[in-house]
């Protein structure tokens, strides 16, 4: 059977939210308990996370076409992971500017100029739509130059690494890099012809 992306006639019916209770909240997220009616009219309690902001991530290249990655300990998985600079956009902040701000704060790097050739929107991914409304918008930036000192959050202990595109693709392929934003950024770049396979 061939499925056409424009044909949604066989999509499942959405759930109806009858009530929502905030079970926990801090500055980063809310844990919500939804009382929902399923398409067959059964009631169900569903736990979901709602983020405090919209995520942004930036995959940056220098003039030698090397890629800037970070290594940071992530307590959720109890590992040091490969990732791109990123964070949360502030309320009403332009997402591209939020990505560039996070890049500068975490690394001290910025593009030499902000043009359509040096800053490119790659796409948006859901972080985990099974239980969360959180998403991340991904940008690629070329011609990075060191522009200033880092201004990291107090809990950010990050090392910076310049890697080749070949190393990056192999690290994604082999599973050494597992971060969703890095994997998605590489896929977007390859699919749009912005990185050679």
Residue ranges and their predicted role:
Residues 31-35, 59, 69, 138-140, ...:
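Conserved hydrophobic/aromatic beta-strand scaffold that supports enzyme active sites
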Residues 50-53, 62-64, 74, 83, ...:
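Active-site segment of metal-dependent pyrophosphate-handling enzymes
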Residues 2-4, 11-14, 49-52, 56-101, ...:
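Conserved Nudix-box catalytic region and its N-terminal flanking loop in Nudix hydrolases
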Residues 2-17, 42, 80, 91, ...:
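Nudix hydrolase/Nudix homology domain
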Residues 15-59, 63:
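Acidic, metal-coordinating catalytic segment for phosphate/diphosphate chemistry
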């Amino acid at each position: 059977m061939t499925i056409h992306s424009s044909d949604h006639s066989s999509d499942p019916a959405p759930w109806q939210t009858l009530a929502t209770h905030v079970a926990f909240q801090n500055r980063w997220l809310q844990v919500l308990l939804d009382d929902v009616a399923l398409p067959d009219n059964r009631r169900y309690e569903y736990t979901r996370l709602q983020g405090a902001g919209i995520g942004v991530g930036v995959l940056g290249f220098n003039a030698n076409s090397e890629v800037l990655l970070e290594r940071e300990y992530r307590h959720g998985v109890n590992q040091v992971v490969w990732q791109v600079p990123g964070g949360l956009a502030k309320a009403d902040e332009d997402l591209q500017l939020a990505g560039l701000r996070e890049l500068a704060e975490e690394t001290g790097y910025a593009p030499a100029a902000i043009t359509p050739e040096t800053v490119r929107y790659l796409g948006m991914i859901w972080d985990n739509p099974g239980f969360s409304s959180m998403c991340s918008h991904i940008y690629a930036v070329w011609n990075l130059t060191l522009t200033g000192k880092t201004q990291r959050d107090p809990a950010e202990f990050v090392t910076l690494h310049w890697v080749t595109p070949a190393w990056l693709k192999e690290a994604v392929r082999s599973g050494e890099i597992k971060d969703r934003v890095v994997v998605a950024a590489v896929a977007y770049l390859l699919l749009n012809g912005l990185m050679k396979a």
